[in-house]
């Protein structure tokens, strides 16, 4: 069976006396990636027009826009300060209207998951055994998000004599979850203007300027940011494992007296790590104070 949180729960039964029995169960799941048609969000043309209307209405920004050609607000700021001619501003504005970056396509994917379980059971007059192995893999909708889990169980009953029985049970699991560090791809795709380009004309990453607050370098006002570069240079991974062993010894000394000894061993481990490399904006804004 499958638990609600996505973890495979493997249940085995005692083998029946006779020949060995092998069973397999598996399932697959697919979920389409999100698309802009599923949301009420502006395209790049609507976003530029909205900014124009807001400026014409006399609305003010919470923070003054950073001068740059990568955003309408930044280009307008350059035009107002005389760093861009009217023709240059109109050309930039018209270009930004046509960018229409599909962030959902760049940052999400069709989710695919699959579960598999193989069990082997068997028994004789002296031995009863049940073995099972399960595997679960899921690629999340956000590119770079995935999980894997492997489970195994072995249960053996030894009838050493008419009055002595030993039960051994071993359970083991291992899993890996990969994710992000400081980046929320889906939220970024749904909240970032589509008039911002992800790539330059030559195919290289396009970096727009973000406000920088770095206490050791007050002269630098902004820093470059590209979410694809950030995802390549940051991340997180959690590895888990567990092992459980139980032992049960029963000795029927008399019809009314049975000696029983029960013991067990349990081991659990979790290794969690997150990272940001030197090319990431996270490192530049936190430690370096300037672009790579």
Regions found by a protein language model. Give the residues of each.
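A beta-strand signature from Gram-negative outer-membrane beta-barrel systems
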Residues: 1-23, 82, 108, 113-115, ...
